[in-house]
């Protein structure tokens, strides 16, 4: 099941991923929840998207993330890398993937869950960061 929320606060539910592909021209989508769907890829994301929930899939890569994105939940996938993160991002949940590195972290980031990956180092952490979870990685002190 796919859940889409528009600026008008109306939530729309779709039973198949194919239906989402028809939505790429909408510019007022603010939330997309496609958790638990065995997806291997995502469509082009709308520029207005603020909240993306795509955990428990089989994603190995991402399309370009929109500049408006504030929350990204992409844990329990097959990701080996993340794209450039938008400056607006405040929450990043990317745990339990195959990440060996993280991109530059945005200055507004407050919460980072990157545990259960293969990280050998972390990028510079922003001063705004309040919660960091990075256990079960290949980090050395």
Give short role names for the model-derived ranges.
Residues 5-55:
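LRR N-terminal entry segment and analogous cap-like coil->beta motifs
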Residues 23, 42-45, 62-65, 82-85, ...:
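Canonical leucine-rich repeat
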Residues 31-38, 48, 53-58, 68, ...:
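Concave beta-strand-loop units of leucine-rich repeat
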